[in-house]
Amino acid sequence: MSKFEVIGGRRLKGELVPQGAKNEALQVICACLLTREEVVISNIPEILDVIKLIDLLRGMGVKVERLQKGEFSFRANEINFDYLETEDFYSKAASLRGSIMILGPLLAMHGCGLVPKPGGDKIGRRRLDTHFLGFEKLGATFE
């Protein structure tokens, strides 16, 4: 069995600023859809998948403002549900596996949602059917 052995004798002290992580950032950003109030999120890694999700939310009608590096303001008070049926939405959402994370907040706030079968990064076992099964157990139906 592998282990880390820490040999010290000195008290640890200091400050550590954690680096933003993509998968957590995608989930936290999607949570802005759970309120119509302004949400400010900091420590967001400005990497391709995160920027794609922010662009997708903008298309949905979420007002997004970059306040400074790694800090954004979101306001989801007017969701454009017509956009969810456009080719632009379909292609953007399908190219981002994390787009599945918009579905829960849309169902919770509006009682409906739409996402194409996501593509994107497929490293490891990350099944999407667990999301759908959970939604069905909460009363959602899928077409």
Task: Name every feature range the model reports, one short phrase each.
Residues 1-143:
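Structural preference for solvent-exposed beta-strand-turn elements
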